């Protein structure tokens, strides 16, 4: 089992901002996961990968695929207190779910 977090490279977020947005996404998606899957993922070392996309549109395409397949996911919108405008979509976490399911949705994306 693993989780993929896809962040928008086109926003050119600072390293700290990127780390915070990825953390928000990861935790939010885990909250959407059933107890059994969450325990399995945590017991397996909480495997995750951070990937990049170049648009908000791509993040919503990924969200649609995850929703269609019944995979937990969370889209993050920034509060706008520092670098970005309020409501800016920054990233999506997909999973945790099986490696195969995550790879089917995110396999064409590059590492961040």
Swiss-Prot record:
It catalyses: an N-acyl-L-alpha-aminoacyl-tRNA + H2O = an N-acyl-L-amino acid + a tRNA + H(+). Gene3D superfamilies: Bit1. Keywords: Cytoplasm, Hydrolase. It comes from the Archaea. GO terms for molecular function: peptidyl-tRNA hydrolase activity. Its main location: cytoplasm. It is an enzyme of class 3 (hydrolase). GO terms for cellular component: cytosol. The natural substrate for this enzyme may be peptidyl-tRNAs which drop off the ribosome during protein synthesis. This is Peptidyl-tRNA hydrolase. It comes from Haloquadratum walsbyi (strain DSM 16790 / HBSQ001).
